[in-house]
Amino acid sequence: MTQLFDTLGFIETSAVRAGAAARDAHGAHQEAATRADVAAVSLVHVGKVFATPRGHAAALRDVTFDVRRGEVFGIIGRSGAGKSTLLRLVNGLERPSSGSVRVQGVDVGALDEDGLVALRRRTGMVFQHFNLLSAKTVFENVALPLKIAGVPKAERTRKVDALLDLVGLAAKRDAYPASLSGGQKQRVGIARALVHDPEVLLCDEATSALDPETTQSILALLADINRRLGLTIVLITHEMEVIRAVCDTVAVIEQGELVETGPVWRVFGDPRHGATRALLSTLVHDLPAELAARVQPLPEQAALPDGAQVVLDVRYTGESGGEPDVGALAAALGGSVRFLHGGIERIQGHAQGRLVIAASPGQSLAHGGAVAALLERARRHANHAEVLGYV
């Protein structure tokens, strides 16, 4: 019920005719103003502290990043990491305890109530829960913010019908929420968020209540809206699959801190923080249990058993921009080469992935030297390579 009131309150305040926005606060950092000139959303050294019965709790600490105009920017982190707090700072539902938040160059923390109303008209919001009014039709739910704002009926009808067509719900115009699927309800929510032609669309776990197939359809819709309208989208999620499917850039939040950010292909191909690697663990080609049980540690001194092969973990980050030349890798390793596990995929045009292979070290070198030579040859044809053991 609280979430429903939050949604209705957001719609109502967004629909009131905006007054003049307050001027930027005196003494704003030059860094913030400069960054905001080229960014749709800019956070500079942002901190947020909440008072609790046990004292003050820091939800965010020194967070700095920019969202470029027209991109889809994903914020990911585990539950309680501070993702939702970040989104509430962007639309002015919370004010930062330190630092600055700017949307289209406007300092959100310096706005008065009229300025916040103007901001929310330019910043659409898609909520995790659909929060539709059950007694109103699809058309009426989408038209409600326009009706509150006093938009003439003919203009409301034209605008809402166009939006329902955009989100694929023209045939459900006169249906009631009870007859809609979860994905259709979220499409209504997306249409409602677009009624004021926002410059930025914020999505708060917009797919977390949906099944995988419906999630993909909603993500495809958001990507289509981004392309067709040139709309900047900021979404928060705890699912790396969502980031991979639709985002251009990702920021990883862990315990209120920004621990990693960059293009999605780079972060996925070469994660540099433990929190990122943990979030990616569900997408990584981990060794199946039966294969892991077969891999034995290399003996420190003794030779490998006859016929044994060294197991190499070869990784491609996509940094080179080309496709992995698996044939060249096999030729460089020489002898018998077997592919045991893994795969290659493309993210933002970059081929990346992991191959677990078994290769013969050869007999021309002592045991340690042969393995080192094999590893060196593998590294010439991949971004990373390491020895897992032997089979």
Swiss-Prot record:
Keyword tags: Amino-acid transport, ATP-binding, Cell inner membrane, Cell membrane, Membrane, Nucleotide-binding, Translocase, Transport
Residues in ABC transporter domain copies: 44-280
Bilayer disposition of the protein: Peripheral membrane protein
EC number(s) stated in the UniProt entry for this protein: 7.4.2.11
Subcellular location: Cell inner membrane
GO molecular function: ABC-type D-methionine transporter activity; ATP binding; ATP hydrolysis activity
Pfam family, one: ABC_tran
Major localization listed first in the record, in broad terms: membrane
SMART domains linked: AAA, NIL
Lipid metabolism as UniProt keyword: no
Top-rank taxon: Bacteria
Subunit and partners: The complex is composed of two ATP-binding proteins (MetN), two transmembrane proteins (MetI) and a solute-binding protein (MetQ).
Family that this chain belongs to: Belongs to the ABC transporter superfamily. Methionine importer (TC 3.A.1.24) family.
PANTHER family the record matches: AMINO ACID IMPORT ATP-BINDING PROTEIN (PTHR43166), METHIONINE IMPORT ATP-BINDING PROTEIN METN (PTHR43166:SF30)
Name of the featured protein: Methionine import ATP-binding protein MetN 2
Species per Swiss-Prot/TrEMBL record: Burkholderia ambifaria (strain ATCC BAA-244 / DSM 16087 / CCUG 44356 / LMG 19182 / AMMD)
Record gene name: metN2
